[in-house]
Amino acid sequence: MSTILTNTWTRREKRIEGHAKILAIGTAIPANWVDQTTYPDFYFRITNSEHLLEHKEKFRRICNKSKIRKRHLVITEELLKKNPNLCTYNEASLNTRQDILVSEVPKLGKEAAMKAIKEWGRPISEITHLVFCTSSGVDMPGADFQLAKLLGLSSSVNRLMMYQQGCNAGAAMLRLAKDLAENNKGGRVLVVCSEVMLNVFRGPSLEQEDYLLAQCLFGDGSAAVIVGTEPRPGLETPLFELVSAAQTTIPDTDSHLKLHLREMGLTFHCSKAVPSLITQNVEDYLVKAFEPFGISDWNSIFWILHPGGIAILDRVEEKLGLEPEKLRASRDVLSESGNLTSAC
């Protein structure tokens, strides 16, 4: 049940001054992991596709060029053998996937949330808002409700569930948390992004070769932050200040990157033009974002670029003339975990 009360005077009284700040960060990954160099052998064996020799060699080349060393996955050989419908390309398997995801996504989210809460050092009862995001499965009550139960949050915590936001979701959740914190005096917002990319795992397709990229790129993981304003001296330690947050969309590009929920799971299509589309537009958008602050030297700022893939990182670095260390954090995440969608 949600209750909305409108009082303009009270609203003005409670609006606080100052920017929202990140007060704690937590991350988590599954214990199970796969070596990228041997993953093509595992993938084609477990999907009964070893006869597709040309496809396998193409996949091996994609993996070798990915600059990913390993990925952590909820998927195990045992799980796939128990559920062979996950290993074909287009067999109806949504029920199987959903049954696994509705449990695993909140559980992985809890691990990151508990680490953030521990770092924060305050009682969990002081959490006023919970924002949960995932592109892995859809359910009601949602993963936010399940996580609130796992954490033992108060039943009066204000919850918001965001499904199917994809790779832009991590930054979008920070933008949302900033708005919530800056409009709720004393509020402490727990943001959790948890991704288990079981929904995109399936066997190879001779007709849909770009799907091999999804099998090479995505990993499982979760991230959590606690956001609030006016940190209490001696009780809370601000890590980062959220000065400004904005979103933009490159026009006429919706056909280049698409994921659709179907009976076979979450389908994936990514055109080869995506890295070029990003690099052709990134500087114009950076100018608009940083001009109000008098910043035009891209090497003078701290970078956390979503590790969407090595081609994106390389081309953005080249386009903006960034020094190698500027994207080191993004490259490290890509190497050690892969693309974690909203969680990185």
Curated annotation (Swiss-Prot):
Its EC number is 2.3.1.74. It catalyses: (E)-4-coumaroyl-CoA + 3 malonyl-CoA + 3 H(+) = 2',4,4',6'-tetrahydroxychalcone + 3 CO2 + 4 CoA. The active site is at 167. It holds the Pfam family Chal_sti_synt_N. One of its GO terms (molecular function) is naringenin-chalcone synthase activity. Keywords: Acyltransferase, Flavonoid biosynthesis, Transferase. GO terms for biological process: flavonoid biosynthetic process; polyketide biosynthetic process. Disulfide bonds: none annotated. InterPro entries: Chalcone/stilbene_synt_C (IPR012328), Chalcone/stilbene_synt_N (IPR001099), Chalcone/stilbene_synthase_AS (IPR018088), Polyketide_synthase_type-III (IPR011141), Thiolase-like (IPR016039). Pathway: Secondary metabolite biosynthesis; flavonoid biosynthesis. PROSITE patterns: CHALCONE_SYNTH (PS00441). It comes from the Eukaryota. PANTHER family: CHALCONE SYNTHASE, HYDROXYMETHYLGLUTARYL-COA SYNTHASE. The primary product of this enzyme is 4,2',4',6'-tetrahydroxychalcone (also termed naringenin-chalcone or chalcone) which can under specific conditions spontaneously isomerize into naringenin. Belongs to the thiolase-like superfamily. Chalcone/stilbene synthases family. This is Chalcone synthase A. The gene is CHSA.
